[in-house]
Every structure is written in structure tokens, then in C-alpha cells.
Design a protein with these regions (language model features):
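PRPP-associated nucleotide enzymes
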Residues: 1-219
Length: 219
């Protein structure tokens, strides 16, 4: 994985993937998985946040649900930062993300705020791009944005920098690529589902995705 960009920072090199093997172990779920993501967030924050930064004039924006696994730890690193959540859902027909609700109105002077967006898996980048698009409506500035993720693939990263070249992106590790169904390679499942369980009205999407992918493999 030799992709480079001046605003991309990758913490763990490809040859040290064994350090994040638990991320791909689908038997690691719930509190155990939350701790794994939290510990990696602590480590990543040493790269993304300066030593004496306590979060003055900053806001942490977790993309629900999975982003909370990172923001819960980041708030301890940046205790003075505000937190404004954004909830993404999938259109049940197109499977594309849309904003269900957000807490951005509570943020005063958003144009001057430093922003930390948390979302563990950066695959197609659809949720992050939709978040950045939505933030602009409130006055947030790309040059003040730091995106923090566990894993990301080149195609999703390129989409972000093409549309938002001024943001900074901090990754724990680069993924190999992306599957046809939009999940990362190596496959790590749905982070929100591994943490909190499958949403009732989306369980059919998970089954359809898994079945469809298996059929493609058998061709």
C-alpha cells in the first residue's frame, strides 16, 4: 500500500498488520471490540493531536453508530472539546447514506471550530463525504477538519481528497481494497453491528449482502 497524499497520515505500516489482527477477527464483538477500537484510538490520537492540546475551540463529531467507539476515548484526550453527533442511515432501496439527525445547531461559531470526525471504517467514504457536505451547511470549514479512522482503502481516500483536498486524514492502517458489496478487504464486518448488534430494520440488508457476495464468489 504505497498510496501517499500530503494530508494523509498512516500510523501502522502494512508490514506490521499483525498489530491490528483483532480488527479482522469477527469473533471479537461487544465490549471486547469496543476496547480494541478505544485502545487504537488512544494510540492514533498521539499522531493526530498535539501533546498539550486539551480540545479548546474544538468539536468531536462521531458518525453514529460506530464513530462513538472512537469518540468516547477521544473525549478523554480532549476534555474541553464539544461533542456533536451525526446519525447516518441507509436508504433501504439504494443503500446510500443519508443524514437522519445531527446535533450541529448547538455548536457556536462553527466556522472557527477545529473538528475531529470519527468513523472506524473508511471504505466507499460515503458516510464521511455526506457528513462533510452536511457540515458545510452550518459553516464548518474543511481546513479545520481532521478525520480519524481505523482502516481506509485507497479508493475511498481518493474520493475524500478529490472533493475536500484541505481536510487531514489520520488512519491506523491501510486496507488492501474494497469488496463489491462495499466492505473493506480484509473483511472486518460492519463495525456498528459488531459493537451494538444489527438494527432490526436493517437485518435483511446484512443477509442480502452476505448472500449476494457468496454467490459472486461461486461464479
Amino acid at each position: 500500500m504505497n498510496y501517499k497524499h500530503p494530508n494523509l497520515f498512516v500510523m501502522i505500516p502494512y508490514e506490521e498488520r499483525n498489530r491490528v489482527s483483532g480488527y479482522f477477527d469477527l469473533s471479537v464483538v461487544g465490549e471486547e471490540y469496543a476496547k480494541l477500537l478505544g485502545d487504537l484510538t488512544d494510540e492514533l490520537s498521539t499522531y493526530a493531536v498535539s501533546k498539550n492540546d486539551v480540545g479548546e475551540n474544538a468539536v468531536i463529531i462521531p458518525i453514529l453508530r460506530a464513530g462513538m467507539s472512537m469518540s468516547n476515548r477521544l473525549t478523554k484526550r480532549l476534555p474541553k472539546a464539544d461533542v456533536a453527533r451525526i446519525s447516518m442511515r441507509r436508504n433501504l432501496h439504494t443503500l446510500k447514506p443519508f443524514v437522519a439527525w445531527d446535533e450541529f445547531e448547538q455548536i457556536k461559531e462553527p466556522e472557527s471550530k477545529r473538528v475531529f470526525i470519527t468513523d472506524p471504517a473508511l471504505a466507499t467514504a460515503g458516510s464521511i463525504l455526506k457528513t462533510l457536505e452536511h457540515m458545510k451547511k452550518y459553516g464548518f470549514k474543511d481546513e479545520n477538519v481532521v478525520i480519524m479512522a481505523m482502516f481506509g482503502c485507497q479508493s475511498g481516500i481518493e474520493r475524500i481528497f478529490k472533493e475536500h483536498p484541505e481536510v487531514k486524514l489520520f488512519l491506523v492502517h491501510m486496507a488492501d481494497g474494497i469488496r463489491e458489496d462495499g466492505y473493506l478487504l480484509p473483511y472486518n464486518g460492519d463495525t456498528g453491528d459488531r459493537l451494538y448488534g444489527v438494527r432490526e430494520n436493517e437485518s435483511w440488508i446484512v443477509k442480502l449482502s452476505a448472500t449476494g457476495y457468496q454467490r459472486r464468489l461461486q461464479r
